[in-house]
UniProtKB/Swiss-Prot annotation:
<dbReference type="Pfam" id="PF13855">
    <property type="entry name" value="LRR_8"/>
</dbReference>
<dbReference type="GO" id="GO:0004535">
    <property type="term" value="F:poly(A)-specific ribonuclease activity"/>
</dbReference>
<feature type="region of interest" description="Disordered">
    <location>
        <begin position="18"/>
        <end position="42"/>
    </location>
</feature>
<keyword id="KW-0805">Transcription regulation</keyword>
<dbReference type="GO" id="GO:0003723">
    <property type="term" value="F:RNA binding"/>
</dbReference>
<feature type="binding site">
    <location>
        <position position="352"/>
    </location>
    <ligand>
        <name>Mg(2+)</name>
    </ligand>
</feature>
<feature type="repeat" description="LRR 1">
    <location>
        <begin position="169"/>
        <end position="190"/>
    </location>
</feature>
<keyword id="KW-0540">Nuclease</keyword>
<dbReference type="Pfam" id="PF03372">
    <property type="entry name" value="Exo_endo_phos"/>
</dbReference>
<feature type="compositionally biased region" description="Polar residues">
    <location>
        <begin position="116"/>
        <end position="131"/>
    </location>
</feature>
<feature type="repeat" description="LRR 4">
    <location>
        <begin position="238"/>
        <end position="259"/>
    </location>
</feature>
<dbReference type="InterPro" id="IPR003591">
    <property type="entry name" value="Leu-rich_rpt_typical-subtyp"/>
</dbReference>
<keyword id="KW-0269">Exonuclease</keyword>
<dbReference type="GO" id="GO:0006260">
    <property type="term" value="P:DNA replication"/>
</dbReference>
<keyword id="KW-0010">Activator</keyword>
<comment type="function">
    <text>Acts as a catalytic component of the CCR4-NOT core complex, which in the nucleus seems to be a general transcription factor, and in the cytoplasm the major mRNA deadenylase involved in mRNA turnover. Ccr4 has 3'-5' RNase activity with a strong preference for polyadenylated substrates and also low exonuclease activity towards single-stranded DNA.</text>
</comment>
<dbReference type="InterPro" id="IPR005135">
    <property type="entry name" value="Endo/exonuclease/phosphatase"/>
</dbReference>
Length: 656
């Protein structure tokens, strides 16, 4: 459907089936989904339709007499109380049984739209301010699609062509009054469906992939032979009407829907969902066999970054498809800890860790694995009562204590740093848009105890809202400015002599300039490849005329542009980036990165993709095996030859 107009164009012609790629939504939708009113008593909706024949594409296309047209009475012992839920069920079932003629719904719409002039559809706003913490810059807009519904009702179809499932733009699909015995698993590809009518067929079971249709609001299955429902239907958290009358449904499920309605049944299936088999381990992709070898003399360092999804953000309104026990912090934190321990990374950067979880769980647990930590909460924690401040999330960075010495630690509050700039005076947007956001970055400066190499490690979390792409860009610019200042300061740090336990360490390195110090910049940047924030980091400069600034006033950053001196690359750019780092029903894209300075470091191995077959039945994270809506990034690096003066190590008094 395009917009909210009462009547839409009805297209009688259907183009030949061909592969059609899925086009992402212009911007991530909000995870907040209010409980809507129950569905209308009528299923004669107005929308764009195509009802052309599928004879050439569908096997056994044989229009014929209707099947399963009669009402089936089962489970007479169940009290079918005439409450509002069951009244609506019976009314919709009666309407469905009257819709047995070929293309009934398409013809109905055609009659209703005769003589009505169609107003041009309004383009969707590209700056949608509503949403949750994981929104981001707009995706590429989808080409205009003139129709969004197909009506193959009353055609006597015995099978469905695979080509049908390439029409991923479909929002409504009518397959009622046919002779279908099964529904192909490929139905899970039609993830934009809001209405699916399979009434009056001979279907005995639904595939698990039905759970992928998380946009469904109406699923009509009247007069089939369905005895049970897959637990994956618990993912259908937007479903308002499940039409199940006329099926020999088992007593437990039927009792649920009769007494409490569709949403209660979906909730029951979700909460009773058994633990699925875990996916295969993500591949360890070796990019440099020589450097990654355990026998290699080169200095290696591993880095992991993960947005852990803090407890306060993991609400049922945001993640309605996730069982409550899986969404609980007690369950998810154990999964996170298990993954951190399994990778045993030298450096760990976590975002969205609240103070209570850092102090009361991760710092203590990871200490058993030789980790020391540095943590700062976001700015809002200042001024709060101690107990209240525990729920404020922030950034936690851990490092192996036996391998590194902590030389310095800093916190960058983007908003506060911006208002302290000399050029901030009179720049309203700094105060009205940027200062109000309390996002931060944590910076630590480390020295390798054995080699003397030093590293700057940045752990950042940027603002999410796609309507504030200028804010994300300026946050990135301020981050790069502050790292530049710190790196120059760190280049002048004296050699570390407090290494008595490692008297045979190599000589310390004195770096000639800040951009010669190896730098890792990890985090959730809430910015996709190609965005302004991404381009600033990757290319080192961005002009003052960039459209993402929208001519807003940010001092010299919007007057003369933005630059930084570092030669930064995304670790995963070596494989063309992952398919996604954030995975939910409405949004899949890349938000998280491990950036590194390519003049000082070389990426030698990476943790690969989540198994694609596993994802065919999983509409979104978190779930039983992935504790956050973000996936962890993990990479191995080698340190390139050091540049700068070498200062001899202090080995203490020597005996003759």
């Amino acid at each position: 459907m395009n917009g909210g107009q009462a009547h839409q164009r009805f297209g009688m012609q259907i183009p030949k089936f061909q592969s059609q790629s899925h086009h992402p939504h212009p911007a991530q939708q909000a995870h907040h989904h209010a409980h809507h009113n129950q569905a209308s008593h009528s299923i004669n909706h107005q929308h764009n339709f195509s009802s052309g024949a599928l004879a050439a594409a569908t096997p056994h296309f044989t229009p014929g007499p209707l099947q399963n047209g009669a009402h089936v009475n089962v489970d007479e012992d169940i009290d079918e109380t005439m409450n509002e839920h069951w009244q609506q069920q019976l009314q919709l079932a009666a309407e469905s049984r009257q819709a047995s003629s070929p293309h009934y719904y398409a013809r109905t719409v055609a009659q209703q739209t005769k003589g009505i002039q169609i107003a041009p559809s309004q383009p969707e706003s590209q700056e949608n301010g509503s949403g949750d913490r994981n929104g981001l810059v707009k995706s590429k807009p989808a080409p205009r699609q003139g129709w969004h519904a197909l009506d193959f009702g009353g055609q006597g179809l015995r099978a469905l062509a695979t080509s049908l499932f390439h029409y991923t733009f479909l929002e409504k699909l009518y397959l009622n009054h046919n002779k279908l015995k099964t529904l192909p698993p490929a139905i899970g590809q039609l993830r934009k469906l809001t209405h699916l009518d399979l009434s009056s067929n001979d279907i005995s079971e639904l595939p698990e992939e039905i759970g992928m249709l998380t946009s469904l609001k109406q699923l009509l299955l009247f007069d089939n032979n369905i005895r049970t429902l897959p637990f994956e239907m618990g993912y259908l958290y937007r479903l308002e009407m499940l039409g199940i009358e006329g099926n020999p449904l088992n007593d437990v499920l039927k009792s649920q829907i009769i007494k409490e309605g569709t949403k209660a049944l979906v909730r029951y299936l979700r909460e009773e969902m058994p633990v699925h088999l875990p996916p295969p381990d993500r591949d360890w992709i070796i990019l440099d066999e020589t450097a990654s070898s355990s026998n290699s003399p080169t200095e290696k360092i591993t880095v992991l970054s993960h947005n852990a999804l803090c407890d306060s953000s993991a609400t049922p309104s945001h993640f309605g498809y996730t069982p409550s026990r899986v969404l609980s912090w007690e369950f998810r934190r154990e999964l996170i800890l298990s993954e951190l321990r399994s990778h045993d990374s030298d450096i760990i950067c976590l975002q969205e860790i609240d103070q209570g979880s850092y102090n009361g769980f991760f710092r203590e647990q990871l200490a058993y694995n030789d980790y020391k930590g540095v943590y700062w909460p976001r700015g809002r924690a200042m001024g709060m009562q101690e107990e209240e401040a525990k729920s404020v999330d922030g950034c936690a960075t851990f490092f192996k204590g036996s391998k590194f010495i902590l030389l310095d630690k800093q916190m960058i509050n983007f908003g506060q740093t911006a208002v302290r700039r000399p050029d901030a005076k009179g720049q309203d947007d700094i105060y009205n848009r940027l200062w109000q956001k309390d996002h931060i970055a944590v910076v630590i400066f480390l020295e390798n105890r054995l080699t003397g190499s030093r590293f700057i490690v940045v752990n950042a979390h940027l603002y999410w809202d796609p309507a504030f792409k200028d804010v994300k860009l300026i946050q990135t610019a301020i981050l790069m400015e502050e790292i530049t200042k710190l790196s120059e300061k760190y280049a002048k740090f004296p050699p570390c002599t407090d290494k008595t336990a490692f008297r045979f360490s190599e000589a310390e390195v004195e770096y000639a300039s800040g951009d010669q110090i190896p730098l890792f910049m990890c985090g959730d940047f809430n910015s996709a490849p190609g965005s302004a924030a991404y381009n600033l980091v990757a290319h080192g400069r961005l002009t003052e005329s960039h459209p993402d600034l929208e001519k807003r006033l940010y001092g010299n950053l919007s007057r003369v542009g933005m630059t930084h001196p570092f030669k930064l690359k995304s670790a995963y750019n070596s494989i063309g980036e992952l398919s996604f780092t954030n995975y939910t029903p409405d949004f899949k894209d890349i938000l998280d990165y491990i950036w590194y300075t390519s003049n000082t470091l070389h990426v030698s191995a990476l943790l690969g993709e989540v198994d694609k077959e596993y994802l065919q039945k999983v509409p979104g994270f978190p779930n039983f095996h992935f504790p956050s809506d973000h996936v962890a990034l993990f990479a191995e690096f080698t340190v390139k030859g050091k540049k700068g003066k070498v200062v001899e190590a202090d080995f203490g008094p020597q005996r003759n």
